[in-house]
Amino acid sequence: MGTEKESPEPDCQKQFQAAVSVIQNLPKNGSYRPSYEEMLRFYSYYKQATMGPCLVPRPGFWDPIGRYKWDAWNSLGKMSREEAMSAYITEMKLVAQKVIDTVPLGEVAEDMFAYFEPLYQVIPDMPRPPETFLRRVTGWKEQVVNGDVGAVSEPPCLPKEPAPPSPESHSPRDLDSEVFCDSLEQLEPELVWTEQRAASGEKRDPRNSPVPPTEKEAAAQAQCSAMAPWAPRARAALLPPVALRRPVALPNVSDPKEVTVSGGVSAAN
């Protein structure tokens, strides 16, 4: 009985790895990129499936993107790893269906759905584009339409079966170093600041901002820092020159010979 309950696990693991591979290999400048909310869900399911429940402390206020990611992961609570893998696969199906429904098939490259090839091999109910679109393309797409999925060659981008890392091997700052589904900063780095400015009505101060300043801001800061040591000297150079004159001896108030005592007798006498 135990074997029957554990039999679906290898299939779920294989589908999960295929979905992770698809997200990892999506082109940055392709016709479709997952939204910020979708990437947050992918990130939280991936962390839950590989590391289990969130046990690390929440990042500080200076790391707003890290706090969004932590909140998404922590919201899953005690969801099991198998449930997280299944949720990841379900989210991948929704993304594929969204691509089919929203991206005009006549304007996309014919090899766009090649990125979903690993999913068609391991997920039977994976959403597929219309057959009229697939018929225009040769290779693996025709085999998928004909049902000959096994004849398709194994994709080289499938990752190996890595063992789930233990929570002890990850520090809080290591959470941003994963390759899979952890590219929120590359998608919309200014989204958090836009939301914060809209809420507070304040402008971003690059001196107190956790986001690195732009090249223009960095150049201005560097110029100010370079001029700082010369500020006193430059100020001194603007002062008017002061002429140094030779001191002149003051004249004697009175001649000793002319000073007399109150009695009329001269002091010299």
UniProtKB/Swiss-Prot annotation:
The keyword Magnesium does not apply. Signal peptide: none annotated. Gene3D superfamilies: 1.20.80.10. The modification Phosphoserine is found at S166, S171. One of its GO terms (biological process) is fatty acid metabolic process. Residues 150-175, 195-226, 248-269 are annotated as: Disordered. Residues 12-101 form the ACB domain. This is Acyl-CoA-binding domain-containing protein 4. Disulfide bonds: none annotated. Keywords: Lipid-binding, Phosphoprotein. One of its GO terms (cellular component) is cytoplasm. Binds medium- and long-chain acyl-CoA esters and may function as an intracellular carrier of acyl-CoA esters. An acyl-CoA binds at residues 23-32, 43-47, 69, 88. Coiled coil: none annotated. One of its GO terms (molecular function) is fatty-acyl-CoA binding. Residues 156-167 have a biased composition (Pro residues). The keyword NADP does not apply.
